[in-house]
Amino acid sequence: MADQQLDYASAKFVTSAPDISKLPPDSGIEVAFAGRSNAGKSSALNTLTRQKALARTSKTPGRTQLINVFELTTGQRLIDLPGYGFAKVPLAVKEKWQRSLSEYLQQRDSLKGIVVLMDIRHPFRETDQELIYWAVDCDLPVLALLTKADKLKQGARKSTVLKAKQAAIAFNGDVQVEAFSSLKRIGVEQVEEKLNQWYSKEYDDE
């Protein structure tokens, strides 16, 4: 069956959950967005959904430790995972978040793909690599977005993306790399295309 063409502008906030046990019932399809606290995750979600304030952009990276749930249509959700890797977050909070993330990736049947956002100037930091390896171990496809792509000139951007694609081979999984810019709307079409594939999986699996 052809991939669904979803209207991402229809996304609506549903709930904020402190951990996986407080999420909506594990049915339908979820796609999760994850990234370091300053990777531009909230801006990417707002750009994708064409809503300026769907996901709150915090001036204090690492402040939000809740899982935010947005619904596109019945049973189709976007999951905004808490930012990770920020130095000012207490160690106990980091450890709790790591446990929660691990549980979510391993146990959530409705999770069909994860978007990992990384600053194009600092891709594949240790925490990013850990997350991608976890996802691959759970047989989850990954879309790695190199955010803030407008910060690099076109030649440098292409070179960085090419190097990142080569580096992604080492994960030995379904890891696609794309440049992304919320400001210039670079890569939005590629994100929509990949998400449409993932949201069509329920039909392919039946």
UniProtKB/Swiss-Prot annotation:
Residues involved in Mg(2+) binding: 42, 64
Domain of life: Bacteria
Cofactor(s) demanded: Mg(2+)
Domain EngB-type G: 27-201
Alphabetized GO MF terms: GTP binding; metal ion binding
A single Gene Ontology CC term: cytosol
Signal peptide boundaries: none
Residues involved in GTP binding: 35-42, 62-66, 80-83, 147-150, 180-182
Cell cycle is among the record's keywords: yes
Keywords: Cell cycle, Cell division, GTP-binding, Magnesium, Metal-binding, Nucleotide-binding, Septation
Family annotation (InterPro entries): G_ENGB_dom, GTP-bd, GTP-bd_ribosome_bio_YsxC, P-loop_NTPase
GO BP field: division septum assembly
Keyword field contains Transmembrane helix: no
Protein family: Belongs to the TRAFAC class TrmE-Era-EngA-EngB-Septin-like GTPase superfamily. EngB GTPase family.
Function noted in UniProt: Necessary for normal cell division and for the maintenance of normal septation.
Protein name: Probable GTP-binding protein EngB
